[in-house]
Amino acid sequence: MADADKSEAAAGDDGSQQQPAEPRRDTHPGEPEKPPRSSANGVKMENDESVKEEKSDLKEKSTGNKKANRFHPYSKDKNSGTGEKKGPNRNRVFISNIPYDMKWQAIKDLMREKVGEVTYVELFKDAEGKSRGCGVVEFKDEEFVKKALETMNKYDLSGRPLNIKEDPDGENARRALQRTGTSFQGSHASDVGSGLVNLPPSILNNPNIPPEVISNLQAGRLGSTIFVANLDFKVGWKKLKEVFSIAGTVKRADIKEDKDGKSRGMGTVTFEQAIEAVQAISMFNGQFLFDRPMHVKMDDKSVPHEDYRSHDSKTSQLPRGLGGIGMGLGPGGQPISASQLNITGVMGNLGPSGMGMDGPGFGGVNRIGGGVGFGGLEAMNSMAGFGGVGRMGELYRGAMTSSMERDFGRGDIGLSRGFGDSFGRLGSAMIGGFAGRIGASNMGPVGTGISGSMSGMSTVTGGMGMGLDRMSSSFDRMGPGIGAILERSIDVDRGFLSGPMGSGMRDRLGSKGNQIFVRNLPFDLTWQKLKEKFSQCGHVMFAEIKMENGKSKGCGTVRFESAESAEKACRIMNGIKISGREIDVRLDRNA
């Protein structure tokens, strides 16, 4: 038995002497195969050697750069090459019920004193920078994890018993954070409050980077491992590392192999930082290596799986049991509401023939008569210079001009052409009659015999001017109402927008009523994810998350191409849950 132990020790010594200068896995071609070792319970642990190699690799890096051994929890990039859970991340514990006033330095000192050497500590905080009472601690060796579970679980800290669980892959911490709708930053930056990462336009507008990758990078949830496919079979891990080192600091490169140890033409590369992995996608996706185009994307383990996936979100807006809906009666198959049908009926003949003000919908402005004061404005032309009738100009300047410019665009409005003959006559009455100065040329043929009567009319017309002045403000208030009705009832591609009113009116009508305001959003939700979420309601022109001091305020706006899409979003998206938060969706009246 002693001889067997000696031979086993000799074999172990020989295996350690044959390790390469740069520690790598024993699966790389050219490296000698190491004999499996047995653990204390007799179970063979074939990966113990690779674990020790990786630890020695981290030890070497820590001498030159202290940040090299700062692990990024929950990114799963340490073990993404093989999908195994054994590696440096196995030495981590999740701690809850921490006093809210406790700092991460105090937790580190406590664990180092009671347990052993600590390599990483992180306390999670909410968007306001307040402690959530939980965090993670990572130890240098695995035996410290067992010791922490034995000695520190239920340890009384400032009157609160600590709850400690082993968390090798970060699942316990991830579930705790998902319940609160937050995410981690993966470094001590989260200890001073979490927030969205500001990315340069070169990343945000890069067509080679998928939107979900950008949003996860902004929120600090993205890992640092990429997956490379369609590699030439002669490409080894050294060549893979050499190539991708152009994009950043490569911590590990692996080639996927079959059971015979031959390359499968794919591999993974783990970088020091997540942004380097994103840069590698931008630089190398589609590029040729040995005449073969590489397919580069984020490794599946580096992208968090959230509860707002596209296939889940599509079914969440429909009533339970309903598989789908057909086309509605509105433009593009959108459902049309009863209120739209009623307004269309009131508007009368406002259709493809144009906006004729004499149509049944408006009742003919010229025929409104004394009720509104438009009666026969042409007949008042000769009285333009008398008394208060001159104030009739305020109706044109104050009411008609302001409301028309506000609701129909600021372009030149041809009254006689754009609004039919009724407004044409109104235009001649106002402009030709009222705008003139007092003088014989404008007074018309007034006989001397009626001068007394006409002077007496000054009082009457003065009072009439005051009435028209008050009517001016009424028309000013009526302007937005007409504009709001028109934008919902008139097809912007047909009708009067193709006429003399010009493009200003089309732009104006296209921008009102098509923006929504969304509240109670998760604080880690990005504008890209918000846009993607609401794209199923219609074409999204713009999406924005309201920010304050670089942090999300939990609300945002989405602007659609049409008002119908905005109304649809209010109907089917209001009340749904995103990351456990029930959102409130309504039309943005301030747009």
From Swiss-Prot:
GO biological process: negative regulation of transcription by RNA polymerase II
Phosphoserine: modified positions: 422
Modification sites for Omega-N-methylarginine: 397, 417
Basic and acidic residues bias spans: 22-36, 45-63, 74-87
Glycyl lysine isopeptide (Lys-Gly) (interchain with G-Cter in SUMO2) crosslink, residue number(s): 44
Protein location: Nucleus
A Pfam cross-reference name: RRM_1
SUPFAM superfamilies: RNA-binding domain, RBD
CDD domains, sorted: RRM1_MYEF2, RRM2_MYEF2, RRM3_MYEF2
Function noted in UniProt: Transcriptional repressor of the myelin basic protein gene (MBP). Binds to the proximal MB1 element 5'-TTGTCC-3' of the MBP promoter. Its binding to MB1 and function are inhibited by PURA.
Protein name: Myelin expression factor 2
Species of provenance: Mus musculus
